[in-house]
Amino acid sequence: MTPKESIGKMKRILFVAAVAICALAQAQQQRTIAGASPGGNSPYATDAYPGFDDVDDSKPPERREPSWLWWRRPKKATPAEQYAYAKELEAAEDFSGAASACDALVREWPSSVEAPQAQLRFAKILAKEQEDYVEAFAQLEYLFDFYARDCPYLELVEYGYKLVNTMRDKKKTWFGLSFLSNKQVRRNYESIVRRAPGAAYVPEAMLKIAEIREEDLQYEEAVKVYEAIATKYPLRIETRTAAYREARARMWLCRRLAYNMVRCGETRGFLRQTMKRYPDIEQMDELKAWLEELEKYMDEAAYKNAKSYDSRRRTPHAALAAWELFLKEHPASPHADEARARIAELSAAPRKETSK
């Protein structure tokens, strides 16, 4: 082999090695980017969840840096020794010390084998021993963001869901004021849904999201979530609950924005569709009452509109068209006989007068 051929062969070997190193580095980088890895063989959901906050509004996760405070630094020389030290503190019921030791390990040796274990132990100590559910969930999110492939992903997302339920049930208050906002709880539920869209508890979680929207008087957004439940999980029992609650939210909007006849018409159609789809629904009497209320309101509004056209300021032709439209859309109205009589009267008028 000539020197020229040897150099060419060496260049090819170096090129292949460089490509392999770049691919390895890229794979490692993807593991540390939030959302790059679903973990647990469970694909992330798309961001197409109407009624959820936009993920772009959330702050992107960042790795925790080693603390410059000496008392928050690792007490041992290696991650293995530090993790063993944290477990010793936990066994001695020094939970605050154990949590700090786990945190220090993750900060100092983020790429170590012990880091995911320490991060999980950190989150569970916060939840179980210190009952700091908000911070525990935040640390669990950190585990998902940076160590998704290094943990039992689906099992821990379900644990996170239970954590948010506990967070919501045990909201701490001070003189009636809560330290935890509905928005934060809702966003935690939304995160759970996005991380495990195929989990069995997701429809239930979405009901909770919509419920919180209603508590905050965000009925437009609540309706979107209820619609998403019906679209994504049509065969689940939660869809019946979502249908009733959507009807209730729509009625709230109709009463609040009664001038919007298009909305009233859409809600009337939704009520009829829901009653037809679920003839044995428990809230049937309530749905019927809402439909009757809505039809009565729309009937009166249409009657007043037709009457407004039947005046000296309008032509007989316009009045005739208004009454015909009213009768077509509201044939069972209490004002139907009056409308028919007026149509007959206007139709019998001289053609010249009617065509003005």
Range-by-range predicted roles:
Residues P3-K9, F15, Q26-K356:
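Acidic, polar-rich low-complexity tracts and alpha-helical solenoid repeat scaffolds
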Residues I13-I21:
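Sec-dependent N-terminal signal peptides
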